[in-house]
């Protein structure tokens, strides 16, 4: 019986060690599952952030194009207004010269 005692103890101890190993493996698997799930969620967040970045860059490009277009139109309108102002000044100057000439002619006719 003395041999069966140590063998039985050894067998029970080996069984206990196997159970502990199995429990540790299950915990590791559970921890890895959580880790992979967290990793996948992080990848989804990164993907969403990248898609938002692409959308914002596209909107920025469109707004920049619109600003450049409006700036060009504004500059053309300013040039046109400047030309209109110059033309008005020339016409006003011509009108004043004609008026002065008419006054001078009227003065000589008297």
Curated annotation (Swiss-Prot):
Phosphoserine: residues bearing it: 2, 4, 10-11, 80, 85
Modified residues (Omega-N-methylarginine): 12
Spans annotated as Linker 1: 26-39
Residue numbers carrying N6-acetyllysine: 53
The entry's keywords: Acetylation, Coiled coil, Cytoplasm, Glycoprotein, Intermediate filament, Isopeptide bond, Keratin, Methylation, Nucleus, Phosphoprotein, Ubl conjugation
Pfam families referenced in this protein's UniProt entry, alphabetically: Filament
Purpose: Together with KRT19, helps to link the contractile apparatus to dystrophin at the costameres of striated muscle.
Protein name from the UniProt record: Keratin, type II cytoskeletal 8
Gene: KRT8
